[in-house]
């Protein structure tokens, strides 16, 4: 019986073609990007902070008399809806082991994160300004709920910080495509 003997044959390196770049390597999955555990945790954190800020504001009986507080409620509702929807998408992508690197989807996420981050930051700043006005300048914290206003505003800033991280990481993903 003729048995073949294994042999190692050296393979030459293909010659480089002038003007042709080597194939691009895909960027590693950095935690916090869409479709990762970190991305899911960021979205859930955004949702929780915005939901608690919304709940605190709505629990104050006269919040609707101040426009900045109404704006904060509207911004946190939008933030809750956006973050919950993307948390569901991230969770689904993790369950079925799919990558969320479609250019159109990543572009949509960048724009959505940018818009919600801007709105949440503006609402938190406006609410912080009114809270400082009521507490420090007018000295009417006894009649108003300054501690609740401050807590809701601080939570809105935390939600903004987390959505800003999502925006930066998603923008980086889009820019390195």
Curated annotation (Swiss-Prot):
Residues 58-68, 125-153 are extracellular. It comes from the Eukaryota. InterPro entries: CASP_dom, CASPL-5. One of its GO terms (cellular component) is plasma membrane. The chain crosses the membrane at residues 37-57, 69-89, 104-124, 154-174. Glycans are attached at residue 62. It is found in: Cell membrane. Keywords: Cell membrane, Glycoprotein, Membrane, Transmembrane, Transmembrane helix. It is a multi-pass membrane protein. Its main location: membrane. Residues 1-36, 90-103, 175-177 are cytoplasmic. Homodimer and heterodimers. Belongs to the Casparian strip membrane proteins (CASP) family. This is CASP-like protein 5A2.
């Amino acid at each position: 019986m003729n048995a073949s003997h294994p042999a190692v044959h050296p393979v030459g390196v293909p010659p480089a073609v002038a003007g042709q770049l080597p194939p691009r390597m895909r960027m590693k999955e950095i935690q916090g990007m869409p479709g990762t555990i970190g991305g899911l945790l960021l979205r859930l954190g955004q949702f929780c902070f915005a939901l608690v800020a919304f709940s605190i504001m709505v629990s104050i009986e006269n919040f609707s008399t101040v426009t900045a507080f109404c704006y904060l409620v509207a911004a946190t509702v939008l933030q809750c809806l956006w973050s919950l929807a993307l948390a569901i998408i991230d969770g689904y992508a993790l369950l079925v082991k799919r990558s969320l690197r479609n250019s159109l989807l990543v572009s949509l996420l960048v724009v959505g994160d940018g818009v919600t981050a801007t709105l949440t930051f503006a609402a938190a700043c406006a609410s912080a300004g009114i809270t400082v006005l009521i507490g420090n300048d007018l000295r009417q914290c006894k009649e108003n709920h300054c501690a609740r206003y401050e807590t809701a505003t601080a939570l809105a800033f935390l939600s903004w910080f987390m959505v800003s991280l999502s925006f930066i990481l998603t923008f980086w993903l889009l820019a390195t495509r």
